[in-house]
Amino acid sequence: MTNTLRLRSLFIMGVSTAAIAAATPALAQQATMLEELVVTAERRDQSLQDVPVAVTAYTSERRDLLGIATVEDLARNSPSVAYTNNDRLSIRGFGRLTNAIGTDPSVALYSDGIFSNSMADSSTPSLFIERTEILRGPQGTLYGRNSVGGALNIIGKRPAYEFEGEVRATVGNYGTWQSDLLVSGPITEGLRFLVGGSVQRRDEGFIDNIGPAGDTSAVKRYMFEAQIEADLGENIVARLRYTKFDWDDSYGVGNVHEAVITPYDTTSITGLGNSALYYNPTSGFAGVNPSIADPFKINTNQTNEGKLSDHQRLHFDLTWDLGGATLKYLFGRQQYVYNTNGDEDRSVRTGNFNIAAATPFGAYTATNISPNQRFFYEEDQTWYSNEINLSSNSDGPLQWITGIYQYNQQYSQPQGLRVLGDPAMQNPLNLATGTPAPLNPDGNYLFVDGSLNVDSYAVFGQIDYDLNEQWSVTAGLRWSKDEKTGTDFARYVSRTNTTTTVLALGGIPAAVGQGLAVDFTTFVVCGGPTIATCHANPLYRNLRAVSTGGLERDLSAEYDAFTGTLGVQWSPDVDTNAYLRYSRGYKSGGWLASNGLTPFPYADAEYVDNYEVGLKKTWGGAFQLNTALFYADYQGFQAPLTVVLNQTTGSTGTQFLNLEALNWGLEVEGQWAPLPGVQLFGSYAYINAEITEGCCYVDTNDPRALQAGARPVGAPLPNGSRNQSLVGSRLPMTPEHKVNLGGNYTIDFTPGSLTLGATYTYTGDMQTGVFGSPRYTSPSNENVDLRALWKDAEDRFTIIGYVKNATDEVAYQSSTPSAVTGLGTFRQTVKLNFPRTVGVEFQYRF
């Protein structure tokens, strides 16, 4: 993206908003005052301008005005927030780099104050949402779970005291349609209900498959919610909330629109990407990858799938007004099973084929090779939590909250790579004996799994004291304890020229070995044919053989920490709020299970010392400017790194690094109502986030450190690879610059009002991994959204027309390379942003 294009876009937005402002006096009648927004960022109702933390908030109405429907939309419109469509949110450079079992999120999501382990809740239709709040910086002295980066609070609508309802319908391009319904009101005196549902469809995928399989990113989703709320006497209110989600999509977790934008590797005999456990399915293939010319085109013979089933959420909250204090109990339970799978070879090639190859034992022909490779991934999670907190509810100078918290999570995560239609893979041999090994009916050449049980406990509290009318102080403290137990499993079945080579060492002729598959698990992990080889290595003495094939080990760890916050706030007048705050954040350590039995799976805990100074200022009720300057010392940053498990097979696994980093930056948010009917808004974020300690590691995708951006250190290793330094690399998911500009213009008519709006966003380039190579870089991108809303005078009807990504810019959320292929290039996998979408939404309230 060139500077010229960025400047041109900024100029166009500036001219457009100026033109709107100039035309306003003759057309709009409403007052030039900004609406006050009340938030619960500190667990009590406060004006957004009075809260001494950096917060961005959206009401349900503002989400409709800006077109914020997904977590991607939230991230794009909010400063210092980034999202990659792997269900990972990052704030100020603090984000989760892997979904591997045994790891925790860096940003906590709360739905009505109850923690959720998935970002899927953030895509709940706005009809069911009262308000969405994004808190930046460590949180912990007010909330149940820890978060080093920040928190995403979603406050849902509660049952109404008077009967009301709303129905919505949306139609758009790509065969999009959506229907939402919500009804709420009293049942009897002191008893209220809410019930509603949503059906969302996108019959045509964003990514056009010119092959025989279906398009990618088609959507079929359902949601149902029911609540009942009761007054238990004059001072107690209890509510039960149940929600069910169901997805049947043609793409993976977190809205993954994925494409490989490099040529097929037609020359390598084995391997796919950086795997070398099976023959390369595109070896000798004559086809051309259409994604090179157009990343929204693929040519595959297998349809991607993403299914969310049995996703149920149960919440219960009880609030008891004790007079000078409020006692609250929160219980939450959530479960889901998520499955995704798709075409791993990314080609349309069908039918088994032969590969002619040379080995140290002469030429041979690998026969009956299946090109149908699939990836598969599953999450099976259940978690529940209990929280009791007691807080002040008076208007005195002292405000306080204290609470206790318990959390349990149970999780399994089977995943891997398989080949379809290969009898040899389904019936492997034992490496040590040559006799049949346990069956491999799914044809998995890589199968890893893990189980996890987490028990967490916390005690927290915070006080805010007004020294006088202008000055107040804040102090908070938290103690956390996390106990984790689990298992880690892997099985490797190989049918490659490596298989033939190793079998030949045992006297098996190449002509025989080329048609066999072998359970190579002990060889890949431990370097020998039997479990005894593993037990001879202290790092693998806890491994055990599994009767169904493969190896397994137990993992366990405990972590605890004290964290807290200190702050001072100065409010010389009702329109000024200046604050200085220190917060210490903690994220428990863990491990990388379901990642290949790496020898060092554990990671230490993360800590963040965050220093922040902020100013929130309002002028005349028509102009607001909120700024925050932060400096964060990031200790123990958990970074996953792919390592080679076995030099002979080339198999890899992932282990954790604990690195040091430094994040500092500036955030500015502003709103201005210069004339009746006109509102201009914008935000800017600058983040300098770099690794300060981290050496020395081999990039398995550039083992000799020859690619651009490599930082080799020391002499080459015996196998020819080179270590690299990570110092100076930017933290992943952290654009240095991010700009959001927009404006709304409302014209009042006798029958209603018409609002025209536009939003422009510039997001700087981002790194996907911890190495500094440009191959891990997602280029900067720009996005323009346009909307028009008509609302009748009685506020019963609303019609919204929208265009998202109006310029149809192709942008990536992440970019990941493979090792160098036989073509001398690498396989580049990108995750795409949404293309241009157009639609109309109808709303009716009764």
Predicted regions and their residues:
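Outer-membrane beta-barrel domain signature, strongest for Gram-negative TonB-dependent receptors
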Residues: 213, 219-401, 407-409, 624-626
